[in-house]
Design a protein with these regions (language model features):
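Bacterial N-terminal signal peptides that target proteins for export
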Residues: 2-10
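Periplasmic/extracellular electron-transfer cofactor-ligation site
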Residues: 31, 37-66, 90-98, 123-127
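Extracytoplasmic electron-transfer domains, predominantly the class I c-type cytochrome c fold
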Residues: 60-121
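Transmembrane beta-barrel domains of Gram-negative outer membranes and organellar outer membranes
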Residues: 111, 127-373
């Protein structure tokens, strides 16, 4: 099976799954909840402390490493419920944490584990830090609304037509509870305007993202992002536009049971003459599956739809489709990879050829590059 056939098979599976009924809301299936606080005190407080602050002395718990502080919202709210649930069900080994964290899947029921998590969540219920449920799988082109601490590299190259390759390195750093700084720098190898091969850096972007809404109950997140693109690439060699450019993004995501929809609607406004303003709309729909009963390696097929409209005489609305698949590489799930193919749906030409794409992400807040495996 070729890569293109595999990607189209992924798309067909994803669309078929979209026709299945969504998972019922767990809250509607339960008449009453177990007492999460009492369960925590009986099963967890001996190591994690009575308040979940991880303040027990090493001499009291018998090991030296620092316990997590569940009252620290800058830490606790970054993680999704499924991450905590996996460590409780399968023990520390499930996410490459110390094996001193035992597995409770035979000691507590699923409902009791959910109640313990709900009790811990109550300590940061009114926190401004967006919940980890909104840290959805990254699509190739659709910027996420969730603020991140990560480094990634996205590489694309033409699969037909003239030779072209671009590799973009991106650094993202959270600022406070709801802000994020982003710096990206592309490196390209192309056939330039002269007809000869050209290699070098492209135009660097510096962006700031501000989250405005993150309602975990409704599954909705919304953020704004502004970016300045600097003319660091050579326009004469075809590696850059030769002018400053400004971008304004509206970012959103909606969680729908097991599925998610992400959107990135933005305008690109070049400062130099001769370059048209552009409007873009990128949208991604997908679902995440996990091995080992939902606690292991994650697989996230997505289908992305891209639109671009340049505001110049004779310019057509350009549309692309990008079937893709993300997979977690490390047990901590802080190292992820994705691959896919960008397929122009119309207006093909030398600058619009099918492209194979892949990326590697390192969520450096969760663990070091060589940790968590």
């Amino acid at each position: 099976m070729t890569i293109r056939q595999a990607l189209w098979l992924t798309l067909c599976v994803l669309l078929a799954l979209a026709c299945m009924p969504l998972r019922a809301d767990a809250a509607s299936e339960k008449q009453s909840q177990p007492d999460g606080r009492a369960l925590f005190q009986a099963n967890c407080a001996a190591c994690h402390g009575e308040n979940g602050a991880g303040d027990r002395k090493p001499s009291d718990i018998g090991f030296a490493f620092k316990m997590p502080n569940f009252t620290d919202c800058s830490f606790a709210n970054r993680e999704a419920d499924v991450d905590w649930s996996s460590s409780i069900h399968r023990g520390g080994r499930a996410r490459a944490f110390p094996r001193t964290m035992p597995a409770f899947d035979h000691a507590l029921s699923d409902e009791e584990i959910d109640a313990v998590i709900a009790y811990l969540r109550g300590k940061c219920e009114k926190s401004a830090w967006p919940r980890g449920e909104f840290n959805l799988p990254l699509a190739m082109f659709t910027e996420k609304a969730f603020p991140e601490d990560e480094v990634l590299n996205i590489t694309s190259f033409n699969t037909s037509g003239q030779r072209a390759m671009t590799s973009t390195s991106i650094f993202e750093k959270r600022l406070g509870a709801t802000g994020q700084l982003e710096v990206n720098l592309p490196f390209s190898s192309i056939v330039g305007p002269s007809g000869h091969g050209e290699t070098g850096i492209g135009d660097m972007g510096v962006a700031y993202k501000q989250n405005l809404l993150a309602d975990v109950d409704s599954g909705t997140i919304f953020s704004l992002l502004g970016e300045v693109v600097l003319p660091t690439g050579s326009a004469a060699k075809g590696l850059g536009d030769g002018t400053f450019s400004f971008e304004t993004h509206a970012l959103f995501a909606q969680i729908m049971g097991d599925y998610f929809l992400q959107g990135d609607v933005f305008g690109a406004l070049p400062a130099g003459k001769g370059l048209p303003n552009e409007a873009h709309g990128n949208f991604s729909f997908g679902r995440t599956f996990a091995e080992d009963g939902g606690w292991g390696r994650s697989w996230s097929p997505q289908i992305e739809f891209l639109t671009t409209q340049a505001f110049a005489p004779g310019e057509k609305l350009q549309m692309d489709i990008v079937p893709q698949l993300q997979v977690s590489l490390s047990r901590r799930q802080h190292i992820l990879a994705s691959f896919g193919e960008r397929i122009p749906l119309n207006d093909r030409g030398p600058d619009r050829q099918p492209q194979f794409m892949f990326y590697i992400i390192w969520d450096w807040y969760d663990a070091g590059l060589l940790q968590g495996w």
